[in-house]
Amino acid sequence: MERPIDLDSYERNTLGMITSPSGNQAKYRTTDRFLRELTSLKIGNEMSRSLLHCYYNTFYGNTEMPVYIDGHFKAIWTLKRVPKGKHGMMDRIMPGHEQVFLNGQDGHPLLHRTCPGDRHLTKELLPIVEDFENAIGGEVVNMVIVDAECCSLDQFKEFDKINKDRKMNIYLLTMMDSNQYHYDDLKIRNDNGLRPIKDSDFIPYKYDKKSRIRSWVTLVEFDYLSNANRKRKNKTTYMVRCSVVKKKNNKLSVIATNQPYDEVASGKELADQYYNRWPCQEAKFKEMKKYCNLNVNHGFKKKEVFNRMADKRLKRAEKSLAYDKRRLENLMGKYTHVKRQMEKRKARFKKDLEKLENQIERINERLEYHKGDENKQRKLWEKKVRNTGQLEGLYQEKIRVLKEKERILSKRKKQILKSIERNKTEVARWKKELENTPFYEIDTEMDHIMANFKILLENSLLYTKNTFFEGKVGMSTLIKQFINHYGDLHIPVGGKIFRFQLNKFDGKGLTKKMRYACKIFNEMKIRTADGVLLEMAVKR
């Protein structure tokens, strides 16, 4: 996982005596050949299952437990076309691997999957749980805790579906985005059913150093389909239980689960279980990146595959093009309707105007030949003239409205035509890319094997910290002051004991802690695969 420069020019026998039965020196060539041999054997998955048994029996052994699942993206620097994830670096979307980790409730990474960079976490959520339980040999997972990336109705229904075939129910616990709920839709359950949430329903949740309340929490029920039902005639419901955490600035965090209401202890415990993601998983990623080189890639062997990314872009462009064509067709229908309305208005105006002019002409004739009551005829003439002016004004107003609609539709037509041309260009581009550009996937076997070693190192560090130091030292202190500490290897005659004698420490506190750790280590009587007893001591 690291290549210290000391190993490149290492000429002594100590490292060889520990790592190889022959006692020969171990350099880069030895370690590289070993890794290549492991890769050629295709033992990554079998290795993961075997190590999982060890971790589970050592750290857990529970009949049931919650697990934390999240993805970690590792960027790959290559000129080849390989799958890309939703991760940017140096002003571009990076290709890489998506590694999905399953961690236990105490933070130990137990199992992982190495996938192409375009793999979404939702596609690996249930498969990695299934692999975990198959390796353990029984149903042990009762809760899967993930971030908001996996919060969807489809995921909740997937968990409901698999519970039909399980003896132990398994539930999903995740965070909801702010656009997935309305505050008014959060309901409190009482004896009479459901009622709106009130400020008095919240109880104190977190306190600051001065014992002042930082946040409040309450348990509510929420219809996940409430947003969709606003636009539907036939309404359906899907109820989830939510822990609502409110901060001082009234910002809400809504944590949702499909666990039945009767099985949820309280909103506080539900929130605690979700927020435990940070120490159990997010902090472990940070730790492993620093001490286990989690971000380092291993193995760049590629194989050519179907260009699914170009195919995805092509289908998206074709869908957009078809949508624009439908929009244009609908718009042209509206445009034709407006044109027809304008022609009808014009014809009707001419007809009405001609009718009024004929009436005025007849009135003028009657006035000229003094037929009928002259006052009535003049009043009627004035009325018809007034109607003619009103008719023209009304016509001009209606024509103005129709012309404004015509102008707006013409503007939209130009925009849609531009979009159609743009989508046609995109379709041609991605069709050419699909036909002519090779697409590769990186063989993940070597990286998968090395990730097993990285998980092994992380769990070994956690085991060392908790077993030999009772969890009283931080990981940084453990690495710098104890694991990387210098000393000598003393081998008595016969070679049946390896005694590691560590140099003195600077402070009495560190020396005392290390001597206590050496005492526990020696009492465990740890032996190598060859039967050699390992002992540790601090020089006086």
Regions found by a protein language model. Name each.
Residues 1, 7-10, 14-15, 27, ...:
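Short, conserved catalytic/metal-binding motifs centered on acidic residues
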Residues 1-33, 63, 73, 361, ...:
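Extended, highly charged clamp/arch subdomains and adjacent linkers
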Residues 11-102:
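Active-site-proximal, Lys/Arg-enriched surface segment
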Residues 89-137, 249-256:
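Electropositive, glycine- and tryptophan-enriched low-complexity nucleic-acid-binding patches
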Residues 116-184:
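Domain-level cores of phosphate- or acyl-group-handling catalytic modules
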Residues 164-280, 405, 502, 516, ...:
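An anionic, glycine-rich sequence signature occurring as long contiguous blocks
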Residues 198-205, 209-213, 315-540:
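A short, flexible helix-boundary coil/loop motif
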Residues 267-299:
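Short amphipathic alpha-helical "interface-anchor" segments enriched in bulky aromatics
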